[in-house]
């Protein structure tokens, strides 16, 4: 019954249907429908043997035939197996390819555990070792020619949307505290108060002696919304959240306050490195208490928990023994260490003109603004896809940099202000993380020595700001400041900031998908309305607002044509603006249109040349910066000034104006020559209009009927007079008689004989000058305007080379 089994198999080949077999007499006379017909030589006449027993069947079949049948059956089974492998699962060829995924992941885990002496048993230890091997390897990744690091295939096995803990060494820490009632969300006029105009200066820091009283209430100027009061009275219970519905709330805040009820928020940690702060507190304020050991002597007296400076010593330094004066000095020192020195370090880091320039340049990449947008357009390369972290450059094409363009008005300003605020928090946290990781025990001991040497100067300083400035000189030296400023900020995208925003909101117990909250909504906008622990966030919010206006990101001032990438900030206007810098515009128009070849030093080597390519021009354009016209600490747009720029406006590569003018004239003459002599239809690359349209064929001139009849009468009279006078006719009609060479057979004057072709078969056209055109008659155009019937196989731009005529 071998044939029946083969028929039931869907993957078995059909060769058995055309092959004769010795047991065909015992098989039923059925064939598959798909089997081809047998040829005449292979047709077997089957006979019905009737009922036979197994013994008779065995005796009737020879032994050699049985062996042949077994061999055929085994061959057919092997063939069926090969057919199943060919037509079935294609993954089982050789080794199972599905095991490669596990093999690769096991190899990565083995590499991660090689540095450990024992194999960790906890999942957290394995995960930590795995993340350190992926994101913090001992050997840094190789750098490619374009500046980015090579792709790491090991990252394919890490969860895509998970935040690795080993990277977020400082970003995962938060300062959980109560939201002040005077936060920005409870100030309906916050957008007007934060608006900056021409002449606004960079914000400054504050101290507790300058702001002695702090108001955290709602204020008299704010009025609750009427529907919020009705809802509170109807429910007969007080509002348990901090956010209050106000009359002047915008649509976003109104929806937010009805969506959530919060009292606390997780503010990103902005503290100085814990190692530094622990050392400063122990040497200046109070001695640090260490955990007790088993063998420690409890009767032994130590300085742990005691003030770093006793009352007797402080009284000798201050030359007073009044308890109130001593207590006031201790409060001043505590405020300077916990609050003001942090603000002092922030201001030194962010307010530096060079650092501010780098911050604004990074914001131009983040928001695809101004000169960065112009460079992307000319180079045809999306430069905003570049992101970096700790000096390593990556190309990420999944990031978004144009999300802010979908917003208008106050919604756009709130979003941009929040993005810049998060960008500053992110940058400061990155700097603090690097600072924390670089410190070792010997550095902390050296810091203790410096603090002990300057202990008296710190406690006897003039005021809180002077104490903070002196302390910042010790713990935040100039070398450390310059090193961090050179490596930061990192290039970020709006997608990265959005992930950071969601990370903060989730840690605060706010679901981002159900509300439209921004982290900056919970930060007060003034120092006198903000608790001192949040003064760092208040300063960063004010600085973010200033940078957003100084970079001209708050409003969209772009337009059409040359104004497509226009930006009013000092980084773009006037030196990088195609609108204000005419030489830069001329240089951008001749990109790729010429190549200057210099004299070769010898006959063998090629001569050095200059070819203005888009890449060369873009590189020089991005590097172009004029510090004389950059006003870091004041909003001073070039458009709002009546004075000329301090530096001369020049191009990027070709800075000599006369050379640039010659190249521009050559390019213009070449384009005009192509329009006149070239073949094809030339299109404007910007508008798409034809630069050399084919004029319509001229229409024959038709005189009015009255003039035509009058002209015909005059011609008939002239012909009769010519026939009367004979050869020569009237004066001035020489050689146009009936018998002259110009006369026709009909005797009419001025009609040359058409059958005769002399040396002037085609006569010149005569143009009458000074004649007043008749009404309705077409004007005669300029003779220098030639008409060409141009044929084109495709649309060509002004920069392409047409076919030679």
Swiss-Prot record:
Residues 348-466 form the RRM domain. Residues 754-763 have a biased composition (Basic residues). Residues 1-88, 684-805 are annotated as: Disordered. GO terms for cellular component: host cell; host cell cytoplasm. InterPro entries: L4 (IPR003381). Disulfide bonds: none annotated. Monomer. Interacts with hexon protein; this interaction allows chaperoning and trimerization of hexon proteins. Interacts (via N-terminus) with host initiation factor EIF4G (via C-terminus). Interacts (via RRM domain) with viral mRNAs that contain the tripartite leader; this interaction allows ribosome shunting and expression of viral late mRNAs. The modification Phosphotyrosine is found at residues 365, 682. It is found in: Host cytoplasm. This is Shutoff protein. Residues 280-345 are annotated as: Binding to host EIF4G. Residues 18-29 have a biased composition (Polar residues). The keyword DNA-binding does not apply. It comes from the Viruses. Pfam families: Adeno_100. It comes from Human adenovirus C serotype 2. Residues 59-70, 79-88 have a biased composition (Basic and acidic residues). Its main location: host cell. Might be cleaved by the viral protease. Residues 726-742 have a biased composition (Gly residues). Protein that inhibits host translation while promoting late viral translation by ribosome shunting. Blocks host cap-dependent translation by binding to eIF4G, displacing MKNK1 from cap initiation complexes and preventing EIF4E phosphorylation. Binds to the tripartite leader sequence of viral late mRNAs and recruits host eIF4G, PABPC1/poly-A binding protein and 40S ribosomes subunits on viral mRNAs, allowing ribosome shunting and efficient translation of late viral mRNAs even though conventional translation via ribosome scanning from the cap has been shut off in the host cell. GO terms for molecular function: RNA binding. All late proteins expressed from the major late promoter are produced by alternative splicing and alternative polyadenylation of the same gene giving rise to non-overlapping ORFs. A leader sequence is present in the N-terminus of all these mRNAs and is recognized by the viral shutoff protein to provide expression although conventional translation via ribosome scanning from the cap has been shut off in the host cell. Induction: Expressed in the late phase of the viral replicative cycle. Keywords: Chaperone, Eukaryotic host gene expression shutoff by virus, Eukaryotic host translation shutoff by virus, Host cytoplasm, Host gene expression shutoff by virus, Host-virus interaction, Inhibition of eukaryotic host translation factors by virus, Late protein, Methylation, Phosphoprotein, RNA-binding, Translational shunt, Transport. One of its GO terms (biological process) is intracellular transport of viral protein in host cell. Belongs to the adenoviridae shutoff protein family. The gene is L4.
